[in-house]
Amino acid sequence: MSDQYAPKPEHKFTFGLWTVGNPGRDPFGPPTRPHLSPVDIVHLLGEVGAYGVNFHDNDLVPIDATPAEHDQIVKDFKKALADTGLKVPMATTNLFSDPAFKDGAFTSNDPRVRAYALSKTMKAMDLGVELGAKVYVVWGGREGVETDAAKDALEAGKRFRDALNFLTHYAKDQKYDLVFALEAKPNEPRHDIYLPTTGSFLGFIETLDHPEMVGVNPEVAHEHMSGLNF
């Protein structure tokens, strides 16, 4: 590869821990790649000229980690960032893997699950800001239904709005230099996901308490699933 095309940090390419660390598993078979720790991934990205690394909370800290384990993982990750010069531009929350979210996170019919989703997101925001994130992505992969009778769509929209309002107020109260980006997808893992397109999110954002703090994160493959493009 000529120097002209060699990747450099100033090109601002960033990668998710969940992409580089993917074990090569699909629904029909077991993992096919060796495990890479978050620290390993940061050093690998540093070697190939990446600018930064992004993560879901549980990509970095396992959901069942003890407080002591959490602190050690974050300490080691910070050292890897310092050693390589990589940045953390964006962070997000895994609101889809825990079985508690089978009916949704912010839109769940169970108020205990909705409270858990908010608590998990606030802790993940704290972690993201601690590591330098300026953008916080919200992807509602479980916010939807398999059948319309499962959930009141209008009530679900209100719950989602209340959650975003709560989180923007939390960010302001904590004086975080943080903006939110809403990521759309029409389906998967739910059969029908609420607010399935970037356009629907643009309309939704205008109904929030602090629309100036919220934007969109168009994901190429998700847009194509809706028959859209950039």
PLM feature spans:
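Short polar catalytic/cofactor-binding loops
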Residues: 16-25
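Active-site acidic/histidine proton-transfer and metal-coordination neighborhood
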Residues: 72-93, 97-215, 225
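Aromatic- and glycine-enriched glycan-recognition loops and surfaces
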Residues: 33-40, 44, 65-79
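Histidine/acidic-residue-rich catalytic or RNA/ligand-binding cores of hydrolases
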Residues: 226-230
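N-terminal amphipathic alpha-helix/helix-capping segment at the start of soluble metabolic enzymes
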Residues: 1-17
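Conserved beta-strand positions
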Residues: 15, 55, 138, 182, ...
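Catalytic domains of carbohydrate-active enzymes, especially glycoside hydrolases
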Residues: 33-61, 123, 132
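Glycine-rich, proline-tolerant flexible connector loops at the mouths of alpha/beta enzymes
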Residues: 52-77, 140-141
